[in-house]
Every structure is written in structure tokens, then in C-alpha cells.
């Protein structure tokens, strides 16, 4: 028996199987999956299991940008599958470790494709007849057959006569069959005028799904589809009859074990936590901004959603966060923009000076601390400088789905505007404001806000800290609710606050006790005492080092926690925040 190579793309659904806010149940090689499309058009292929209690996610609710399990209400975001909300802990950030297993997914040729391995390329069409390139493509209904895929292919080969009426042929001799993709793709044609693609999906060792697409000079009529249904019933009955006979006369226990071993070989359930990416394109967007296209080596690009960022280890060793600029259909490489900061501590300078086409960089799985939330309100997108990157990603997604929105970009001058082609493509949704100083910007913002009812808009803003503070203040003054104002900082200008007095730290779970000395941060004291806390920006911006607190009088200096989270006293960003009392107890 030939081994099945799982490092390839498999069809698991048709485009029509994913209507708005639906979750589709599919099975590939014994792996159950929940397939769903978010409101930006991105498709997700997830393991059909909630990480919390194991309930099938196909029983859950597609809320537009997230999938909610119906058992305890845990919610997972489109793209990464990361948990975003736990109803039992409403005031706490979701657990970082709670993430649905995700699979690479593509939407091509009218089908949804996924893989359990690491395919080297993209899904391919089996069409090779030049006369049919411009034909009308119509997906026919998929047929589930209780038989092994090899048996179905064999029956299909032997029963082409069942399709005579479908093709309007005189006899089976007028039909031509070609097998591709290791018998998973069958192309049947009649003299170049009509063709049907059959794509075989191996659900389990004893069940397969036959997907089909007909190519015709014009839109196929009712008769063709009726005749196709009749023909596929003939194929299904014949294949299942053969399978039943084999089961009744053969001891297949050994074959079953062998097949399961073949199916599971080299399977990869989820993408890695980080990638090695090669720089395939580097473009100078402005005098101080470059864009980079980073293609993962050995893995397809993971699913992602607007507002996500990746962390990159730069050639000189710094870890920096960069927002994705990708449009919804750009699924080959991570696309980022990097501004060379005058006072760079090494990150942006290294990206500009050391990174060339061909350079390999370590990149994390995308995270989303700035999601585009589907609220049915009108999004006002406001960006300044390099803050355009996540805002542009959001705008492209909204534009593709035909949503109402507007984008305002504040820049020093036209020559300082990056991604000009992408921005121009947004048409009259784009408003560029050039050469405005801080006072002029503050004067302009009320004009933007006041033409809308405060209850009908969401505000998203990203850029320099003073600008974000100004946008937030103007929006609040206009009556826009705080929870409808969302922002992301790239960096803070303030120096990292350090302790001016010694205080004690106790770890509740281990009982360890140590002190934070004057001139040190809580994070540094933890690391010095072998307390492992993951950290990244060390400026209170990214949220990576968020740490639970049991007790202590906290002094917050971050921009990550919400006002409600700060007031709860349950969380601290140890990279910049500190304790005002003599002792802090961490829930570690």
C-alpha cells in the first residue's frame, strides 16, 4: 500500500458551504474540523474542539470576528484561534495558553483547502484544457460516500456511462478521463466543450466526500444538475455496494491499523509558535520607512485578522513588534512597515541597516491586541505617521467586505506617506491631512467626529502617544463611549519608571520572597531571581508581561491595561509599573 503524503492541500468544502456567520463541519483523514468565515472574508480551519472542555466548536456561534463555544462561552478570535473572552472571569485578560489548534487554509478555485502537514506550494487546479479556461465554473453539490477513496475512484472510472446525459454525449466513448493529484483529482471532459472536476476528500479510512465543479460555455441549466445528481447516486450506490462486499468477506483489522498509521504520519495539527521567515521583498516607502515581505520557510502563512502584529528578533538581537499591513487576500508573506527612529535603541536601525532580501528572521505567531470588532457601528480610523500600518490593514478588510467606514491619515508631508498605492485604492474613504501641527490636529478632529452621532461610531487610532491621547480626548468630549475608542501605541516617549524605594515581592504559589531595589523595575527583579516572565517591548505597550496580583498598592505606568483593569488591582505590567506599598504579592 502506498503511503499518503499529508504535506499537500486537500479540499474540504466549497465556497458555498460557508455562508455568513455559519460554522461548517468537515473531517479530513479522521481529523474533525470547524470551518468558518469571519466578516472580513477570511476563512478559518480549526480543530473541532474547544480547549476548555472539549465541546465541538461546530455547535458554537460565529459572531463575525470570533467563534464562541456554547458550553461555557469561551470566545476565540479569527486567525490565531487565541482565547479573547472568558465569561467567568470578565475582568481578567484571557489565558494566553488557551488557543484552538488551527490548520493552514486557502480559498481557491471555488473550494476551501487545508492540510495536516506542510505543503510546499499553493492548491492547484487540475484544469489543463485551454478551451475551457474562460468557461463558466459552477460548483455542484458534494456527495458523501461510505467507501474508501480508492474504491470510489475505481467505480468512477468503470461507470463513465452514468454521465452520458450530464455531458450530452452519444456514448461513454465520447468522454475522456484524466487522473491527477494522486487520484484525488479526476477530470472528465467531452471534446473540450464541457468538463467536470472531481476532487476527492478522504474523510476517514471508510468514508470520502466527492466535490465537483462543472465548466460550461454558459450557466448550466436545471437538466444538467438533475442528471449529475442521478449519475452520482449511481456512483455512490455502486461504491458502497463494493465496500460492503469487501467488509463481509475480508478481515480488515490489520489494514485498518496500517491505514491509520499512514494517515497520521508527519501530521502537524497546529502552526508553530514562531517561524523562520525569509525577506523576499524590501521596498523603500519613504525616506525613513521601509516595507518588508517576510515569507515563512517550510510553513504556509497562518490565518490572521486585522490589527494583528508579529514580534521579530532583529539581526542585532532586539525583539520588536510590527503590525501587519496585509490585505485580506495577501496570504503568502507577512507584510510590515518599519520606520527608522532617530533615537533607535537598535531595533529599527538594525531592520534598516542589516535586513536585505534573503535575510532570515525569527518571527512569532501573530497576536491581536488591537482587533477590529464587528459592532455594526461606523468605524472612524485615525492614523499618524507609521501608525498607518494596522489602520491600513483594517481599512483594506472593511473595504473588501463593503462596510461603511472612513480613514483619516495625518502626516508631515506627501513624501512622508508610505503605502501610497494601497491608500489610493481606498478611494473616497481616504482623507489625508498634511502638515498639521499638534494644535491644528486638535482643531481638526472635532470636525471629523461631530458629523456622526456619538452612539453610532467606533474610533480606532494608532500613532504617536500625544496624538492618540488627543484623539481619545476629543472622542470622549464628543460623547463617544470609552469602550468604543480603541488604540494601539507603537512606543512611549516616557522613560521607564523605576523604583525609588525598596519593596518586597512575594510569590503566592511558591512562597518565594525577594526585594525590588531602588533604581530597578519589578520585571528586572523577577528575572534576577529566576522568576520567568515573558516580556517583549519593556515599555508597557505590548501586554506580553502582564502579571496577576493578589495584593499591593499599585502604581500603573503602562498603556495596555484598561481603566477598569487598573482599578481592579488584579494586574500589573512589571516592565514599567510598580508598588507604592511595602509589599506586593504576585499570583505566581
Curated annotation (Swiss-Prot):
GO BP: any one term: alkaloid catabolic process
Domain FAD-binding FR-type: residue ranges: 272-373
Pfam families associated with the record: Fer2, Rieske
Domain of life according to the entry: Bacteria
Residues of the Rieske domain: 9-114
Gene Ontology molecular function terms on file: 2 iron, 2 sulfur cluster binding; metal ion binding; oxidoreductase activity
UniProt entry tagged with the keyword Ligase: no
Secretion signal span: none
Known EC number: 1.-.-.-
Details of cofactor binding: Binds 1 [2Fe-2S] cluster per subunit.
Domain (2Fe-2S ferredoxin-type) ranges: 503-588
Cofactor(s) required, per the database record: [2Fe-2S] cluster
Key words of the record: 2Fe-2S, Alkaloid metabolism, Flavoprotein, Iron, Iron-sulfur, Metal-binding, Oxidoreductase
InterPro entries (UniProt xref): 2Fe-2S_ferredoxin-like_sf (IPR036010), 2Fe-2S_ferredoxin-type (IPR001041), 2Fe2S_fd_BS (IPR006058), Beta-grasp_dom_sf (IPR012675), FAD-bd_FR_type (IPR017927), FNR_nucleotide-bd (IPR039261), MRET (IPR050415), Riboflavin_synthase-like_b-brl (IPR017938)
Biological role stated in the UniProt entry: Involved in the caffeine degradation, which is the essential first step for assimilating the carbon and nitrogen in caffeine. Catalyzes the oxidation of NADH and transfers electrons to NdmA and NdmB, which catalyze the N-demethylation reactions.
Name of the protein in its database record: Oxidoreductase NdmD
Organism: Pseudomonas putida (Arthrobacter siderocapsulatus)
Amino acid at each position: 500500500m502506498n503511503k499518503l503524503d499529508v504535506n499537500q492541500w486537500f479540499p474540504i468544502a466549497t465556497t458555498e458551504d460557508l455562508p455568513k456567520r455559519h460554522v461548517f463541519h468537515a473531517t479530513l483523514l479522521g481529523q474533525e474540523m470547524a470551518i468558518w468565515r469571519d466578516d472580513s472574508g477570511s476563512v478559518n480551519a480549526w480543530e473541532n474542539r474547544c480547549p476548555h472542555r472539549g465541546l465541538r466548536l461546530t455547535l458554537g456561534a460565529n459572531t463575525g470576528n470570533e467563534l464562541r463555544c456554547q458550553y461555557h462561552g469561551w470566545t476565540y478570535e479569527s486567525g490565531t484561534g487565541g482565547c479573547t473572552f472568558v465569561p467567568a472571569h470578565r475582568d481578567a485578560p484571557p489565558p494566553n495558553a488557551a488557543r484552538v489548534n488551527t490548520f493552514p487554509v486557502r480559498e481557491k478555485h471555488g473550494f476551501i483547502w487545508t492540510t495536516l502537514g506542510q505543503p510546499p506550494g499553493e492548491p492547484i487546479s487540475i484544469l489543463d484544457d485551454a478551451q475551457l479556461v474562460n468557461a463558466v465554473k459552477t460548483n455542484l453539490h458534494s456527495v458523501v460516500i461510505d467507501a474508501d477513496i480508492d474504491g470510489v475512484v475505481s467505480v468512477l472510472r468503470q461507470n463513465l456511462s452514468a454521465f452520458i446525459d450530464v455531458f450530452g454525449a452519444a456514448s461513454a466513448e465520447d468522454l475522456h478521463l484524466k487522473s491527477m493529484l494522486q487520484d484525488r483529482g479526476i477530470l472528465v471532459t467531452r471534446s473540450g466543450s464541457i468538463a467536470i472536476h472531481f476532487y476527492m476528500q478522504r474523510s476517514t479510512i471508510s468514508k470520502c466526500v466527492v466535490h465537483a465543479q462543472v465548466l460550461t460555455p454558459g450557466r448550466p441549466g436545471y437538466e444538467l444538475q438533475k442528471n449529475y445528481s442521478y449519475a452520482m447516486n449511481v456512483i455512490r450506490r455502486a461504491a458502497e455496494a463494493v465496500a460492503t462486499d469487501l467488509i463481509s468477506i475480508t478481515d480488515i483489522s490489520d489494514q485498518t491499523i496500517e491505514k491509520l498509521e499512514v494517515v497520521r504520519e508527519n501530521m502537524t495539527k497546529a502552526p508553530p509558535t514562531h517561524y523562520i521567515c525569509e525577506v523576499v521583498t524590501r521596498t523603500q516607502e519613504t525616506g525613513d520607512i521601509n516595507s518588508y515581505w517576510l515569507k515563512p520557510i517550510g510553513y504556509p502563512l497562518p490565518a490572521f485578522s486585522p490589527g494583528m502584529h508579529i514580534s521579530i528578533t532583529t539581526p542585532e538581537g532586539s525583539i520588536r513588534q510590527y503590525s501587519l499591513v496585509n490585505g485580506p487576500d495577501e496570504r503568502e508573506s507577512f507584510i510590515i512597515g518599519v520606520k527608522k527612529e532617530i533615537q533607535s535603541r537598535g531595533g529599527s536601525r538594525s531592520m534598516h541597516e542589516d535586513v536585505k532580501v534573503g535575510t532570515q528572521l525569527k518571527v512569532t505567531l501573530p497576536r491581536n491586541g488591537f482587533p477590529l470588532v464587528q459592532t455594526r457601528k461606523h468605524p472612524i480610523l485615525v492614523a499618524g505617521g507609521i501608525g498607518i500600518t494596522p489602520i491600513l490593514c483594517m481599512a483594506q478588510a472593511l473595504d473588501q467586505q463593503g462596510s461603511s467606514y472612513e480613514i483619516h491619515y495625518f502626516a508631515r508631508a506627501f513624501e512622508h506617506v508610505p503605502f501610497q498605492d494601497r491608500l489610493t485604492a481606498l478611494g473616497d474613504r481616504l482623507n489625508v491631512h498634511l502638515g498639521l501641527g499638534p494644535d491644528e490636529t486638535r482643531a481638526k478632529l472635532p470636525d471629523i467626529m461631530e458629523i456622526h452621532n456619538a452612539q453610532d461610531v467606533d474610533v480606532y487610532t494608532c500613532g504617536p502617544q500625544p496624538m492618540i491621547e488627543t484623539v481619545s480626548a476629543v472622542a470622549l468630549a464628543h460623547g463617544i463611549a470609552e469602550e468604543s475608542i480603541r488604540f494601539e501605541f507603537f512606543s512611549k516617549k516616557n522613560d521607564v519608571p523605576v523604583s525609588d524605594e525598596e519593596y518586597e515581592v512575594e510569590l503566592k504559589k511558591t512562597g518565594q520572597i525577594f526585594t525590588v531595589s531602588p533604581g530597578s523595575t519589578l520585571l528586572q527583579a523577577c528575572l534576577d531571581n529566576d522568576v520567568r516572565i515573558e516580556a517583549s517591548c519593556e515599555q508597557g505597550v505590548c501586554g506580553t508581561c502582564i502579571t496577576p496580583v493578589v495584593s499591593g498598592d499599585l502604581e500603573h505606568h503602562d498603556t495596555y491595561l484598561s481603566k477598569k483593569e487598573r482599578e481592579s488591582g488584579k494586574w500589573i505590567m512589571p516592565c514599567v509599573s510598580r508598588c507604592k506599598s511595602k509589599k506586593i504579592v504576585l499570583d505566581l
